[in-house]
A protein has these predicted regions:
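Active-site loop segments of alpha/beta catalytic cores
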Residues: 1-254
Length: 254
């Protein structure tokens, strides 16, 4: 609670959890292998189901206790699962319903009971799951990956924007990695232009990749800051990349 109070006093939103909380596909695949996990889901493998249940119970209880201790000061509870990849969904709606829907519904309900909003990380093409996740109680979708099929953020906003807040959308695969600062500025302006009344947490589509030009990263924050009412003054006061590169803690920027 003291940490939450300190963050609130500094004007920050308070978020608990990570993209690795729950995470029944990707994290379990790190030990069993992705092919095996996908087969497990099809075959209802009891070993996999036992691991999944253990993860669910662990992260559910960790977040429940954290929310309870914070006493209503948490804004968002974060979890994640990679239901999609670069080319399309990795599982069917039937598999989602059989293995994941009830667990996420129970988790979202618990989070809401403590006055927090739900936030879920999903890589890749996951458009087909958004309606159902909204029904189950999802509030914020992290992160919009625009280089995948069916994930145009303008279309997603049109379809789901009245029920869902989006996070991300500035591409780490193209614009930030290979573009110019002017390209980054243009993408930031286009993204924010789609959300004149809010509904987007602007940011990169994933972790900014090693080798991405520092000038592009700074362009993201400078442009967003010039269009926002408030932003961290430390970021806006940075000098040239050459002068400041050794002073920037990138982890704190994201």
């Amino acid at each position: 609670r003291q940490q939450a109070e300190a963050l609130r006093e500094r004007g920050f939103a308070v978020c608990i959890g990570t993209a690795g909380d729950m995470d029944f596909i990707n994290s379990i695949a790190r030990t069993r292998g992705m092919e095996q996990v996908l087969m497990d889901l099809i075959e209802d493998n009891p070993v996999y189901l036992e691991i999944m249940q253990a993860r669910f119970e662990f992260f559910y209880e960790v977040q429940r206790r954290t929310l309870e201790a914070a006493g209503g000061l948490v804004d968002f509870a974060h979890a994640g699962d990679d239901f999609g990849n670069q080319r399309g969904p990795m599982i069917s709606p039937a598999i989602f319903e059989r293995h994941f829907a009830a667990k996420y519904g129970e988790y979202f309900e618990m989070v809401h009971s403590h006055g927090a909003r739900t936030m879920m990380h999903m890589c890749g093409c996951v458009e087909r799951f958004l309606s159902r996740l909204i029904e189950l109680g999802l509030d914020v979708y992290d992160v919009v990956q625009p280089t995948t099929p069916s994930m145009d953020i303008a279309v997603l906003k049109e379809r789901f924007g009245d029920r869902l807040t989006f996070c991300g959308s500035v591409c780490v695969q193209t614009t930030l990695a290979w573009g110019t600062p002017q390209d980054v500025e243009g993408e930031v302006r286009r993204r924010l232009g789609l959300f004149p009344q809010g509904g987007l947490f602007l940011g990169p589509t994933h972790a900014i990749q090693v080798g991405s030009p520092l000038e592009n990263i700074l362009a993201l924050y400078h442009t967003a800051g010039s269009l926002a009412e408030t932003i961290d003054e430390k970021i806006l006061s940075l000098g040239t990349a050459a002068e400041q590169s050794d002073k920037i803690n990138l982890a704190k920027l994201f």
